From Swiss-Prot:
PROSITE patterns: RNA_POL_BETA. The RNAP catalytic core consists of 2 alpha, 1 beta, 1 beta' and 1 omega subunit. When a sigma factor is associated with the core the holoenzyme is formed, which can initiate transcription. GO terms for biological process: DNA-templated transcription. It catalyses: RNA(n) + a ribonucleoside 5'-triphosphate = RNA(n+1) + diphosphate. Coiled coil: none annotated. GO terms for cellular component: DNA-directed RNA polymerase complex. It holds the Pfam family RNA_pol_Rpb2_3. This is DNA-directed RNA polymerase subunit beta. InterPro entries: DNA-dir_RNA_pol_bsu_ext_1_sf (IPR042107), DNA-dir_RNA_pol_bsu_external_1 (IPR019462), DNA-dir_RNA_pol_su2 (IPR015712), DNA-dir_RNAP_su2_dom (IPR007120), DNA-dir_RNAP_su2_hyb_sf (IPR037033), RNA_pol_bsu_bac (IPR010243), RNA_pol_bsu_CS (IPR007121), RNA_pol_bsu_protrusion (IPR007644). GO terms for molecular function: DNA binding; DNA-directed RNA polymerase activity; ribonucleoside binding. Keywords: DNA-directed RNA polymerase, Nucleotidyltransferase, Transcription, Transferase. It comes from the Bacteria. The keyword Transcription applies.
Length: 1342
């Protein structure tokens, strides 16, 4: 493999056995592609805004005299960029402008004659835009729209599993689900009649639907039944015989062949053997007794030819009288329906009998009554309602997906068709349902991923936009119908409010629009790749059963079987598998390598769950020979959801990668294959809660996915083009782009600005640090700067800690964790949290609130950290209770006592008519002020601090832009200088002249002169561009802010809080091994090894066997080897070993084990080898990909390389006594995470606080400043101790005895420490509840 200069800095040793066939697709593509589809112009009008407009326009007036047509749309430029939107608390969006055409028709002239056409561009609200990382900024906060997994439109056949009827009979049903419109259900009842329901309302006989479609009874029977013909021959009845149709019936008479031999005896059931004998004998007609025919059903109407009278109607039951009447009417043959209890039920025939309607109108009226009970039906209303239900494009749409699924399920050739239903569709669904009822087909599996599809951002936004447009459509129609339209323009017809409201509501408060989890890069990526079955049009937690939540065979490679939340949402919220993507229809697809005649090709096909069923698919770890042929004769493979063994010639596909079945979070757990699934689930979920530490530390044992996550998450800065690093500081990186990658006529400079100390959604700190140095060569895709939780472009969620598995005085009982003081002292798990506190000054009824440092009744010391505007200084260290922003609010006039009047007369007015409502630091917080933002309403005078901040921002912007300009100008002048020197001008003369004067020189060579003119033009352009950019920025900074009504000023203060690790904090490994820190012990008390190296963390060995997460042990061993090799390299560097020796040792390390990785260290220069070795001093990072990782032998080999015992266990000594422990202990390096469950956020004590209204007991929880619950069991404990008085005060004055606690407070004030308990309020609540049951209880005084 060829490594770039940056990649050579640190190379991860990979234990993967299989080469990567397919790169992992861009992780955020599900979000970005979907939204791009929504926003981009779609010529076909199938997707996005274009589709929404085309589905609603043109809007015609009721009279048909006017029509509003859609022409095109365009999105404007957003006013603020993403960062500005976050600071100002506004939505990152672009204005939508739509070109509409109003066409007026001439009433007097011929229909369709155009009188007037007006075209105009109309503003239709703002459309939120997606940032380049797949998020939306709504009201200043980053949000993610989670994709939804919903039931695909189409037709589904199911049964009730025998739960509906007491007999336990299985009742089958069919459901036609459109993308939008009414649901259509067909279902059987216990008597085998077929019913129809529309939108889950009252059921009607299904044949009403057929009658409403104008199908006569005879035709209905013809569609659903085969016919038997009977010939009347004198007094004999000759029935046509199809031997197959007799199977299962009981012979009521002997059936003889032409020779008189008995083929079937009377009373015998006719079996397949009998039917074969009948076929062989060639019997096509049999004489049958009249009784045999009685009870059969007539297939058609029979009319007396002479009188025209109906003799027998279709679907009548055959009686002897009927047959005689037919005979008298001159009929010699008649047809009956072929009905057979076994596999040709009489369902439709029976249903027709209970159907009260006889013609189309009656059927329509019946449907109207069911849909609109209580309204009088008219013919037109009934027809309109029925047509609108399933046959109108405005009201009903199956969508292309629905039509494809519908046709495919009914076995049709084509997968395209109309979005509405037609007669054939409804009949075919009923036929298919009857086929299933007859046992000739199976019901559908609704949890199959072929029946569930993904709705992503773009599609959901389009639907919401359409909802807004439909609201507008109604208003436009009414407006078009009102009188004179000659003076009306399209602008006057459209009100953009409903559209904006629909879109805003979706992005702001829809169930699927979630506050982005921004704990660390992994949690961001996972949030964007999440798939939820909840949300509008989806399931609800309460109704979802086990089947929906369970892992389904079709999840393989599409949805991760591991990563899902614990708790009520388990299985309803899933994560996309690593290689999965959605196809055009929204179904999940996963890639497979094609196999032809047992040979694996490089061709890769993406298959959806629907297509996958018919193939036999081998796993990724199948053995191949050198030619790429399947080596074994029998191969384990998946076929139709089952795992079977098949011959190699039958195998059609194989997996792309062993990690294709798991999600991103699960694929960064090393040795995942050795962990129990439940613990792996916890491990995957807990990685998302890891807080970024002060100094990120790459995992020594990883899986090789760390780089992908770090780069795709967007937290790092990645080079867009190759070049050389020209300039680096903490906030900016400048790259001089390679000549071959620049476009003709551009400056060839790329500038990357870094994010510094910004607050994330979870209050963690986002900060980027450059990883490159000036002069280094860069390739496109190289990581230039690390973000939070990344180290040299690799994900680094935690720290590598030296751990020992051993008990230590009970301090690691029940998953507790014992850590060394060194961990805290070295700030290994110190994290920075940034809190935003805001103070709002409003205009009140009594006058405006003021932000000032003149606050009543506050001493000088409390105002020491405020400036004269009343806002805290940046850099001030504050603690709980300190004032951050001084604010006073006017208070109402109160009646003053004479003393107060006197004081006011002497000391002036001010102090008494305002109250102090300053913003103070919350009690449990202490930190440093790192930033202050002041927002002032337009028209309100800015205070001194606001002007200072404004001036500072302007200076910063000017500096940034002029730096940018200078860098670009330098590039331009460098090109001009080269050109002039080539043209023969001396360098010294150029140096002495002003640079801008160079462009005035005239050259003899025409081509050179043209090029110089071009360069001069470019210079003028970038100068003008600089002025323009600065003016735009200046206007943005100096203009007033658009604040909510009644708000005059907002001050936002940002506090940085540094949190060291402490007892009570939660920590975890990557294998679901979580625990809480019990205590921090001095370094000298910790167990140490022979060399005197103490361990950092002591874990309980009993946490491993029952949890079955052995991955942590293997990680510990491999981590020990990785660190040991690092120590060896460090020693070599310190002892200045020969380069050849160092190189050969590194070769041995990277070449160990059977691996596909090829690191050609011979191509590395000595400097590169030294730099690589320098970065490996703390340990050689290793990758053990999931399901393809390091074997036990390889781990042992690495331990040997590090000169460590193969067992991975070493002798430890007790730090307190110096004695050796009884037996060797497993010691190694494990990657530990600090989770966002910090004791500082949970610690809480109540003094006095609020009480619940009903029970009068203290509220619960930190947010409510609540008390500690003293529950039932705690009461038992005090009872057991006999602590009667303690118990009494717990149940009365400390809880809900209102009078008692008031008296006690009074007593304490008086210095009298007694309590008089009264009646607890909860007793009164109990009395009231008993009274509500109708039992009166009263307390009588003795």
């Amino acid at each position: 493999m060829v490594y770039s200069y940056s990649e050579k800095k640190r190379i991860r040793k990979d234990f993967g056995k299989r080469p990567q066939v397919l790169e992992i697709p861009y992780l955020l593509s599900i979000q970005l592609d979907s939204f791009k589809k929504f926003i981009d112009l779609d010529v076909d009008g199938q997707h996005g805004l274009e589709a929404a407009f085309r589905s609603v326009f043109p809007i015609k007036s009721y009279s048909g005299n006017a029509e509003l047509q859609y022409v095109s749309y365009r999105l404007g430029e957003p006013v603020f960029d993403v960062k500005e939107c976050q600071i100002r608390g506004v939505t990152f969006s672009a204005p939508l402008r739509v070109k509409l055409r109003l066409v007026l028709f001439d009433r007097e002239a011929a229909p369709g004659t155009v009188k007037d056409i007006k075209e105009q561009e109309v503003y239709m609200g703002e459309i939120p835009l997606m940032t380049e990382n797949g998020t939306f900024v709504i009201n200043g906060t980053e949000r993610v729209i989670v994709s939804q997994l919903h039931r695909s439109p189409g037709v589904f056949f199911d049964h009730d599993k025998g739960k509906t009827h007491s007999s336990g009979k299985v009742l089958y049903n069919a459901r036609v689900i459109p993308y939008r419109g009414s649901w259509l259900d067909f279902e059987f009842d216990p008597k085998d009649n077929l019913y129809v329901r529309i939108d889950r309302r009252r059921k009607l006989p299904a044949t009403i639907m057929l009658r409403a479609l104008e199908i006569p009874t005879e035709e209905i029977l013809g569609m659903f039944f085969e016919k038997n013909q009977v010939r009347i021959d004198g007094n004999r009845f000759m029935s046509d015989i199809v031997p197959d149709r007799l199977r299962g019936e009981t012979a009521q008479f002997d059936i003889l062949d032409s020779d008189g031999n008995v083929l079937v005896e009377a009373g015998r059931r006719i079996s397949a053997r009998h039917t074969r004998a009948l076929e062989k004998a060639g019997i096509v007609e049999l004489e049958v007794p009249a009784e045999y025919l009685v009870g059969r059903v007539f297939a058609c109407d029979y009319v007396d030819q002479e009188t025209g009278e109906l003799v027998v109607a279709a679907n009548d039951l055959l009686t002897l009288e009927n047959v005689l009447a037919l005979k008298e009417a001159g009929y010699t043959t008649f047809e009956t329906l072929y009905i057979n209890e076994l596999d040709h039920g009489a369902y439709i025939s029976d249903t027709l009998r209970i159907d009260s309607s006889t013609n189309r109108l009656e059927a329509l009226v019946e449907i109207y009554r069911m849909m609109r009970p209580g309204e009088p039906p008219t013919k037109d209303a009934a027809e309109t309602l029925f047509t609108n239900l399933f046959f109108s494009e405005d009201r009903y749409d199956l969508s292309s997906v629905g039509r494809m699924k519908f046709n495919r399920r009914l076995g049709r050739e084509t997968s395209i068709g109309a979005g509405t239903l037609d007669k054939d569709d409804i009949v075919d669904v009923m036929k298919q349902l009857i086929t299933i009822r007859d046992g000739k087909d199976d019901v559908d599996d609704i949890d199959h991923l072929g029946n569930r599809r993904i709705r992503s951002v773009g599609e959901m936004a389009e639907n919401q936009f359409r909802v807004g447009l439909v609201r507008v459509e109604r208003a436009v129609k009414e407006r078009l119908s009102l009188g004179d339209l000659d003076a009306v323009m399209p602008q006057d017809l459209i009100n953009a409010k409903p559209i904006s409201a629909a879109v805003k509501e979706f992005f702001g408060s829809s169930q699927l629009s979630q506050f982005m989890d921004q704990n660390n890069p992994l949690s961001e990526v996972t949030d964007k790749r999440r798939i939820s079955a909840l949300g509008p049009g989806g399931l609800t937690r309460e109704r979802a059963g086990f089947e929906v939540r369970d892992v389904h065979p079709t999840h393989y490679g599409r949805v991760c079987p591991i990563e899902t939340p614990e708790g009520p949402n388990i299985g309803l919220i899933n994560s996309l598998a690593s290689f999965a993507r959605t196809n055009d229809f929204g179904f999940l697809e996963t890639p497979y390598r094609k196999i032809v005649d047992g040979v694996v090709t490089d061709e890769i096909d993406y298959l959806s769950a629907i297509e996958e069923g018919q193939f036999s698919i081998a796993q990724a770890n199948v053995v191949l020979d050198e030619t790429g042929r399947l080596a074994d004769d029998l191969i384990p493979c998946r076929h139709r959801g089952e795992t079977t063994l098949k011959e190699s010639s039958e195998i059609t596909y194989m997996d792309v990668s062993p990690q294709q079945i798991v999600s991103i979070a699960a694929s960064i757990i090393p040795f995942l294959e050795h962990d129990d699934a439940n613990r792996a689930l916890m491990g995957a979920n807990m990685q998302r809660q890891a807080v970024p530490t002060l100094i990120a530390d790459k995992p020594l044992v990883g899986t090789g996915m760390e780089k992908t996550v770090a780069v795709d998450s967007g937290v790092t800065v990645v080079a867009k083009r190759g070049g050389r690093v020209d300039y680096v500081d903490a906030s900016r990186i400048v790259i001089k782009v390679n000549e071959e990658e620049t476009v003709a006529g551009e400056a060839g400079i790329d500038i990357y600005n870094l994010t510094k100390y910004t607050r994330s959604n979870q209050n963690t700190c986002i900060n980027q640090r450059p990883t490159c140095n000036v002069g280094e060569p860069i390739v496109a895709g190289d990581v230039l700067a690390d973000g939070p939780s990344t180290d040299l472009g690799e994900l680094a969620l935690g720290q590598n800690m030296r751990i020992a598995f051993m008990p230590w005085n009970g301090y690691n009982f029940e998953d507790s964790i014992l850590i060394s003081e060194r961990v805290a002292m070295e700030d290994r798990f110190t994290t920075i949290h940034i809190q935003e506190l805001s103070c709002v000054a409003r205009d009140t009824k009594l006058g405006p609130e003021e932000i000032s440092s003149d606050i009543p009744n506050v001493g000088e010391s409390a105002l020491g950290k405020l400036d004269e505007s009343g806002v805290v200084y940046i850099g001030a260290e504050v603690k709980g209770g300190d004032i951050l922003v001084g604010k006073v609010t006017p208070k109402g006039e109160t009646q003053l006592t004479p003393e107060e009047k006197l004081l006011r007369a002497i000391f002036g007015e001010k102090a008494s008519d305002v109250k102090d409502t300053s913003l103070r630091v919350p009690n449990s917080v202490r930190g440093t002020v790192i930033d202050v933002q002041v927002f002032t309403r337009d028209g309100v005078e800015k205070d001194k601090r606001a002007l200072e901040i404004e001036g500072m921002q302007l200076r910063q912007v000017k500096k940034d832009l002029s730096d940018e300009f200078n860098i670009l100008a330098d590039g331009i002048f460098a090109r001009a200088k080269n050109l002039l020197i080539k043209s023969g001008i001396e360098e010294s003369r150029l140096e002495s002249a002003q640079r801008e004067k160079w462009f005035d020189l005239t050259l003899t060579d025409e081509d050179a002169q043209t090029e110089l003119d071009q360069i001069a033009e470019q210079f003028v352009e970038i100068k003008a561009d600089f002025d323009k950019k600065f003016e735009i920025k200046r206007r943005k900074i100096t203009q007033g802010d658009d604040l909510q009504p009644g708000v005059l000023k907002i001050v936002k203060v940002y506090l940085a809080v540094k949190r060291q690790i402490q007892p009570g904090d939660k920590m975890a490994g990557r294998h679901g091994n979580k625990g809480v820190i019990s205590t921090i012990k001095p370094v000298e008390d910790m167990p140490y090894d022979v060399n005197g190296t103490p361990v950092d963390i002591v874990l309980n060995p009993l946490g491993v066997p029952s949890r079955m997460n052995i991955g942590q042990i293997l990680e510990t061993h491999l981590g020990m080897a990785a660190h040991g090799i690092g120590v060896k390299i460090d020693r070599m560097l310190k002892e200045h070993e020969e380069m050849a020796k160092l190189r050969s040792f590194l070769k041995e390390v990277y070449g160990a084990g059977t691996t596909h990785q090829e690191v050609d260290l011979d191509n590395f220069s000595d400097d590169e080898i030294t730099r690589l070795a320098d970065n490996l001093r703390k340990g050689v990072p290793m990758a053990t990909p999931v399901f393809d990782g390091a074997t036990e032998a390889e781990i042992k080999h690495m331990l040997t390389l590090a000169d460590l015992p193969e067992s991975g266990q070493i002798a430890l000594f007790d730090g307190r006594t110096g004695r050796e422990f009884e037996r060797p202990v497993t010691v190694g390096y494990m990657y530990m995470l600090k989770l966002n469950h910090l004791v500082d956020d949970k610690m809480h004590a109540r003094s006095t606080g609020s009480y619940s209204l009903v029970t009068q007991q203290p509220l619960g929880g930190k947010a409510q400043f609540g008390g500690q619950r003293f529950g039932e069991m705690e009461v038992w404990a005090l009872e057991a101790y006999g602590a009667a008085y303690t118990l009494q005060e717990m149940l009365t004055v400390k809880s809900d005895d209102v009078n008692g606690r008031t008296k006690m407070y009074k007593n304490i004030v008086d210095g009298d420490h007694r309590m008089e308990p009264g009646m607890p309020e909860s007793f009164n609540v109990l009395l009231k509840e008993i009274r509500s049951l109708g039992i009166n209880i009263e307390l009588e005084e003795q």
